[in-house]
Amino acid sequence: MTSTLPPLPDDASAATFVPPPEAVVAAPFDQLALPAPVLANLTRLGYHLMTPIQAASLPVALAGHDLIAQAKTGSGKTAAFALPLLQRLDARSFAVQALVMCPTRELAEQVTQEIRRIARAEDNIKILTLCGGTPIRPQADSLAHGAHVVVGTPGRLMDHISRGSLKLDSLATLVLDEADRMLDMGFFDDIAYVAKACPK
């Protein structure tokens, strides 16, 4: 089968702007270099053909490139970043290896649920949601027991970093979901604080 996926960039040192989703032809997930159990789980979940944003971004992200992408709600963008971040996890290490920042608690909870669904093919992947509006101490206790992926809002993530309960020394993936909305909501300083705490 001839690949309909976009070519990969030559330079992995800079963020790649993926092509507009409407310019990418949908392709099956088995064109991606994903393990068989992951592909089987995607089929069980009803993922057959990649959406345009998935086809545009997954090959780039799975190859280890940073990227900047834009897509509408309901376009499948969560899977577009969840699959690559899950592939980079070391399940044997319960240090935080992936961090997803979202503008609201509601979106963070939705993202967490979708990542959990996609992670079913992996063994013992722990995903935590850290948002305001709930007590911080139970969240800190959960972090102390270890987690692979953290999804949260900027302010609460900043709180945990400043308290020392969220350590990002082992972080491999940082996702800003709806970054434009977070900036519109005045989270620039919070995002900058969290980003500064991430490994270079």
Model-derived segments and their meaning:
Residues A55-L67, T78-S93, L99, E109, ...:
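Walker A/P-loop NTP-binding motif
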Residues Q54, A69, V150-T153, D177:
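Hydrophobic beta-strand scaffold positions of dinucleotide-using enzymes
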Residues P37-H48, S93-S162, S170-T173:
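Conserved nucleic-acid-binding Ia/Ib motif block in the N-terminal RecA-like helicase ATPase lobe
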Residues M158-K200:
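SF2 helicase catalytic motif II
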Residues M1-H65:
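N-terminal intrinsically disordered, low-complexity tails of helicases
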Residues A71-S75:
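The conserved Walker
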Residues V60-A61, S142, L166:
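Conserved alpha-helical segment in the helical subdomain of ABC-type ATPase nucleotide-binding domains
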